[in-house]
């Protein structure tokens, strides 16, 4: 879970300035992050649950990602796993996130109002703290188009805040 995004000039979420106040998380929507065990993504696995069909494993939203898709020139050993363990993020702007105690902007069905104004985040400490001396030069990020089936859908924004 991330802290509320904060900018000194033109803040998108003014509640970020509130310390020890329940309003601090009022625009936080639900963000799920997870990895899928390779047992569920291998077509030839005898341990795969029966309800997962080969069609399920071919669907872009549920299939495994092979090393060759992301790193086409990487040589894998004979005992290496060919499926890349990826961090999956799923954002639900209509659903209340953790510590969101906002009671005013909620629809009668319990979903959040103004989903376009909501945010979700995840944060992690990066070691070491001096990225320049550690020779960290870029972030590599692979994004699956969430609108594969609906090209008319309006998207959101993705931000990376490196501190």
Predicted regions and their residues:
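Surface-exposed, low-hydrophobicity segments enriched in Gly/Pro/acidic/Ser residues
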Residues: 1-163
């Amino acid at each position: 879970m991330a802290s509320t995004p904060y900018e000194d000039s033109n803040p998108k979420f003014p509640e970020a300035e509130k310390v020890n106040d329940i309003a601090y998380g009022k625009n936080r929507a639900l963000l799920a992050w997870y990895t899928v065990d390779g047992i569920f993504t291998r077509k030839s696995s005898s341990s795969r649950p029966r309800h997962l069909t080969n069609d399920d494993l071919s669907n872009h939203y549920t299939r495994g990602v092979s090393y060759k898709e992301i790193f086409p020139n990487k040589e894998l050993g004979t005992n290496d796993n060919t499926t890349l363990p990826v961090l999956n993020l799923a954002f639900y702007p209509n659903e209340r996130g953790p510590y969101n105690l906002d009671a005013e902007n909620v629809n009668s069905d319990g979903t959040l109002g103004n989903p376009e104004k909501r945010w979700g985040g995840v944060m992690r400490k990066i070691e070491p703290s001096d990225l320049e001396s550690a020779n960290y030069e870029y972030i590599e990020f692979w994004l699956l188009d969430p609108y594969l089936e609906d090209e008319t859908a309006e998207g959101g924004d993705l931000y990376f805040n490196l501190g």
